[in-house]
């Protein structure tokens, strides 16, 4: 899972993501460093939390580098990035964008094995019964 939550990177606790932080949960900056500086792909199966421009650009970049980006999830009912990035980074690559959704659980002991995503209501609270699990290593 790659956390792309705005221009200032925040900790998992500050983002309200429950559970532990096993290996495989990266901020956008760390994921970019792996790819750009170390020429290392951080994962094969990816879930991205946050639809800002960096999140969408990372979705495209990871896809171009050979990863499978399952989806980009945004807690707000609208994308937080530019419309052109929704088109050029997600739609052009067949990457789904789920608005009003957020990660409600992180799975894995030593390494991330998946996340649970839930739809949220107008108060940004998870809606019971909407949970869906996604297998991912990042």
Where are these regions (language model features)?
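Alpha-helix boundary/interfacial micro-motifs
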Residues: 16-17, 22-25, 41, 46-47, ...
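A short linear-motif detector with a strong N-terminal bias
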Residues: 4-6, 25-28, 49-51, 75-77, ...
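A Rossmann-like FAD-binding core segment of flavoenzymes
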Residues: 63-138
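FAD-binding core/adjacent interface of flavoenzyme oxidoreductases
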Residues: 1-45, 121-137
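Feature captures the FAD/FMN-dependent oxidoreductase FAD-binding
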Residues: 1-8, 47, 54-55, 105-112
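Short glycine-/acidic-enriched loop or helix-start segments at secondary-structure transitions
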Residues: 12-14, 37, 57-59, 108-109
């Amino acid at each position: 899972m790659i956390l792309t939550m705005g221009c200032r990177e925040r900790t998992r606790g500050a983002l309200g993501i429950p559970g532990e932080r096993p290996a495989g949960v990266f901020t956008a900056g760390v994921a970019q460093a792996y790819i750009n500086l170390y020429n290392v792909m951080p994962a094969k199966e990816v879930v991205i939390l946050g639809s800002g421009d960096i999140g969408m650009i990372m979705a495209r970049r990871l896809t171009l580098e050979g990863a499978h980006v399952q989806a980009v999830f945004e807690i707000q009912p609208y994308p937080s990035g530019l419309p052109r990035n929704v088109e050029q980074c997600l739609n052009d690559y067949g990457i789904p964008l789920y608005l009003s959704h957020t990660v409600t659980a992180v799975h894995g002991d030593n390494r991330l094995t998946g996340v649970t995503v839930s739809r949220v209501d107008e108060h940004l609270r998870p809606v019971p019964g909407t949970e869906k699990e996604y297998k991912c290593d990042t």
